[in-house]
């Protein structure tokens, strides 16, 4: 049997894992990206994208059965009739918790980013200064200016555009 050797192995093809694999590959590392879920093809795998609210059986709302079967996932704002197929089913993959902690999961290429409208806004200088300004929690070890060039790098790659307003 042929042995496969990799310089880097990335587990999870969510937003961070996918980006890490891209960066390693572009630097010439032989990279293996492992994902437990399916690939999500644009348009084809978004069966509800072009549906209007009145076209859903429950007008986009959850049923009592949905909530009963998914007590954790159903607490997420995005777990609705139009997107619940991207969430891991709580009964099939139960949570083990010592203390309450709502952690949603999505097993597919893109991970949870597919479940929260694929939107991420830049934090501002104000956001990074919160702990120091408000006098609680642990201060950030970096500031906005440290991340700004990386924000620009990623935004250029993914095609972010628009006004600064």
Regions found by a protein language model. Name each.
Residues 42-45, 161-165:
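Short, glycine/acidic-rich hinge or "gate" loops at secondary-structure transitions
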Residues 150-158:
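A structural-propensity feature for long, helix-poor, extended segments
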Residues 2-131, 136, 141, 145, ...:
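N-terminal glycine-rich phosphate/pyrophosphate-binding loop and immediately adjacent elements
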């Amino acid at each position: 049997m042929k042995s496969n050797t990799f310089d880097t192995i990335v587990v999870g093809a969510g937003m961070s894992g996918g980006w890490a694999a891209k960066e390693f590959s572009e630097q010439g590392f032989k990279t293996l990206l492992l994902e437990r879920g399916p690939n999500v093809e644009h348009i084809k795998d978004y069966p509800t994208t072009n549906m209007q609210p009145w076209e859903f059986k429950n007008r986009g709302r959850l049923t009592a059965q949905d909530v009963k079967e998914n007590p954790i996932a159903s607490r997420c704002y995005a777990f609705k009739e139009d997107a619940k197929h991207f969430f891991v089913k709580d009964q099939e993959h139960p949570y083990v918790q010592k203390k309450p902690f709502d952690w949603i999961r999505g097993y597919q290429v893109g991970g949870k980013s597919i479940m929260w409208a694929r939107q991420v806004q830049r934090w501002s200088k104000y956001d990074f200064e919160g702990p120091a300004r408000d006098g609680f929690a642990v201060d950030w070890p970096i500031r906005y200016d440290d991340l700004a060039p990386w924000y620009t790098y990623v935004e250029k790659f993914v095609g972010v555009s628009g006004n600064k307003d």
